[in-house]
Amino acid sequence: MYKRSDKVAEAIHELVSGLLVKGLKDPRIGFVTITGVKVSDDIRHATIYYTVMGSDEAKKSTLHGLNSSVGFIRKEVSKELRLRFAPELIFKYDESIEYGNRIDQLLKEIGSEEGGND
């Protein structure tokens, strides 16, 4: 059974992903992927998780670009979802993909070491 906040999170995910592709013209926002959205039960706060291809500098630049676009994105969310109150949007870099890649790399190293010891 879905809660209303889950449905709103899904809708925000789709809307923000679409805005990043065609709605925002900020050059600081590079190749960004929205990986998830968590919305509080009262729908007052939404945390948007994203990843960026590129260096640490690109990640910082993208965060600055996203934070400067929060007002526009929030207005679009409110307008498209017809919410009485637009949720406060917080962008957070999603480190889970990098973490997963690091674990995978370590497991491969362990596997190759064990294979070499036979």
Swiss-Prot record:
One example of a Gene Ontology biological process annotation: maturation of SSU-rRNA
SUPFAM superfamilies registered for this protein in UniProt: Ribosome-binding factor A, RbfA
UniProt keyword annotations, A-Z: Cytoplasm, Ribosome biogenesis
InterPro entries: KH_dom-like_a/b (IPR015946), RbfA (IPR000238), RbfA_dom_sf (IPR023799), Ribosome-bd_factorA_CS (IPR020053)
Sample GO molecular function, one term: ribosomal small subunit binding
Primary localization class, coarse: cytoplasm
A Pfam short name: RBFA
Protein localization: Cytoplasm
GO CC annotations, alphabetized: cytosol
Gene3D superfamilies per the UniProt record, alphabetical: 3.30.300.20
Domain of life from the UniProt record: Bacteria
Reported function: One of several proteins that assist in the late maturation steps of the functional core of the 30S ribosomal subunit. Associates with free 30S ribosomal subunits (but not with 30S subunits that are part of 70S ribosomes or polysomes). Required for efficient processing of 16S rRNA. May interact with the 5'-terminal helix region of 16S rRNA.
Subunit structure: Monomer. Binds 30S ribosomal subunits, but not 50S ribosomal subunits or 70S ribosomes.
Similarity comment: Belongs to the RbfA family.
Protein name in the entry: Ribosome-binding factor A
Species this protein is from: Geobacter metallireducens (strain ATCC 53774 / DSM 7210 / GS-15)
Gene: rbfA
